[in-house]
């Protein structure tokens, strides 16, 4: 196979990345060049086309150094999320007079770092931290990573900065807290994490962040929405894939929530009518021109642009993307067998019988007799409108949030909640904006409110947790970008379907070939690309198939900038194995029709 090619290309390589990062963050002079410290309280998940800030107390998707938006998509371009968080709420029957309680994170953080060691006793938060690993930490080019987590311009990154980030990856790999619940591959099967044998992480991810939080700090919970602590521990795992397909446009977020209780909680304590929600304040480029939407069948809530050009993306020559959240795995609830009269069937001892034909995903496996709840409500509101954010620091905020969790307007009368109304049908609904903007069908944003600063809430429930119970929620933060704002919505939904299928199949999807090791020679109006010189690289790229797929050849693309997506590129050449295979079939989005 010919692997040497002479191309006539515009000299744009790597320039865009440098310019995109140059003006951000604090000057390099503020960092000690010879003693660079990489924070273990805050970091980024940034292995693919999306980058997101996270902090060890649960603060999420907001830059903790600047206070600005904290999710960038596509990576190294503009921001899409100002802040997000997970909210939980339910009727807590643990002996305390205050039953209705809500916790989690929005603009205030109702959680603190650390595990719950026993009822009402939390780990010293000063000993808890974030852990971040990536599989290629020893050999990867970490300059852009260092630029992002240290908040400095790319051209300001020194060898000391890069090696400090590399050293932190190594430390986190060696100190991975498996004993606290952090996931790992137990290669020797002894149940203990040994970094010389085992590997931290899950789901074949290329980058993983793990930390644990709890809600036992009453000062934090009351500052949020006036509630008392519940006694919940949440083990949080974020992960991503260094891929160029749909998995490269996603950040996965898993919340493993354990009800461990407050010090006063009775042994028979239970949380009834409990809900989880993904809350988000999206700012897609310019926050003043945003629309929101939902796809109920996909359990997807999202934000997109109301106009064709967004000031945040025009400098990059990009149409505005669409970004959303999907409950890939909701909380589990039992599914019971029914008798001939439609009642729950029982055995001879009076025990209710589970229907084991129903299967839920739980703990990276399958659990017969249960089902995962989907998104059970999607609501939105606009900053400054009649329906706005629940009140921080006051118990009325708890009441408002509990109505939101159940799909009602954020008012404080829990017994008499006010529903949302579809303005096209005048029917009450728990799923606002559930039309299809790409096809102009159903209720889409712009009615009754004009474009502006949006909040979105995806809720799932109800379910019950007894003391000692564990529930899991897995949320995907996804992006889609195409040639215009509405095609970006279609691309987002296509990505979501791919990601849900991959998740349901435990990520048994074909991996793309390893990128070849390319040598570049620049001549007068000519660039020579040579990827036939490194035998090990050739073997890594061509020698191993994946999930039934075998290597067939190379496509070479020219892109307008380093930030551009493959859809913006022009295919320059194909170098194909001469084996009679002329067509490779696959599922792809028709970007013209959506």
Positions of PLM-derived features:
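Hydrophobic h-region of N-terminal signal peptides that target proteins for export
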Residues: 6-18
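Extracellular/surface-associated beta-sandwich interaction domains
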Residues: 20-594
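Positively charged n-region of N-terminal signal peptides that target proteins for export
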Residues: 1-4
